[in-house]
From Swiss-Prot:
Descriptive protein name: ADP-L-glycero-D-manno-heptose-6-epimerase
Quaternary structure note: Homopentamer.
Family: Belongs to the NAD(P)-dependent epimerase/dehydratase family. HldD subfamily.
Active site (record annotation): Y140, K178
Gene field: hldD
Binding site for substrate: N169, S180, H187, F201, S202, G203, S204, R209, Y272
EC number in record: 5.1.3.20
Species in which this protein is naturally found: Pectobacterium carotovorum subsp. carotovorum (strain PC1)
Binding site for NADP(+): 10-11, 31-32, 38, 53, 75-79, 92, 144, 170, 178
Amino acid sequence: MIIVTGGAGFIGSNIVKSLNDIGYRDILVVDNLKDGTKFVNLVDLDIADYMDKEDFIASIVAGDDLGDIDAVFHEGACSSTTEWDGKYMMDNNYQYSKDVLHYCLDRNIPFLYASSAATYGGRNDNFIEERQYEQPLNVYGYSKFLFDQYVREILPEAESQICGFRYFNVYGPREGHKGSMASVAFHLNNQINQGENPKLFSGSENFKRDFVYVGDVAAVNLWFWQNGVSGIFNCGTGRAESFQAVADATLAFHKKGGVEYIEFPEKLKGRYQAYTQADLTNLRAAGYDKPFKTVAEGVAEYMAWLNRTV
């Protein structure tokens, strides 16, 4: 059995899909379905069982036998960069992750988890997986950074796989439940389908991010599990592309509309990453040599998926 926490969420459900694609169906999804809309991410997928997150935490803290587990993909977290309830964030992201990690270490279960490029903070170069480059801007980034630090202390003595991935700007299928935290491609598509012009902040040709397609993110997770590699790795394309490029790819699919530029919001000034670009040196050195989709390629595939029934 494989456990995917956050398995009804964006990246988690895409990992479930990728496992299904290689014939794996003995999957336990752990999630919190208080937001019932997330169930749609699972309806076309095959899983063996579902467990509520609180019940799962109680089970692992009690040391319950959950059966023969091949791996845990720990994607369950609060991923909102605008959430400032630090107690909630540390319970949900840091303590929960420690509980799952120790359950896995005690049983030699491979543990692969979601870190984040938010650990780097507002820098605009040297996105390298080393302490000197890490200075998160928000409590979400701090919760991810602190768990990475915890893992770094444990890694040298660990007898089973521990692997963390610093996800950059992930976009693609099954993110609709994320609301305002969904990708810009998702929102631009909605705006066009509602008869509006797609909207970007003024200067969006200068705002560049490492936009990585969720299918590529799932592929990275599966490769590292199958190859037993441990460590903390950036998970992006290694390319910074502009928000304008995302809009251009969206418009190219729809063949209508033009970008409308709006003022940059005051509340985001100083808390907004204007530039991200994953350094893939360590990922490539670990042996992962598959290509990553460009924005033009990934957005085209995503638009086809989003509009398949429209």
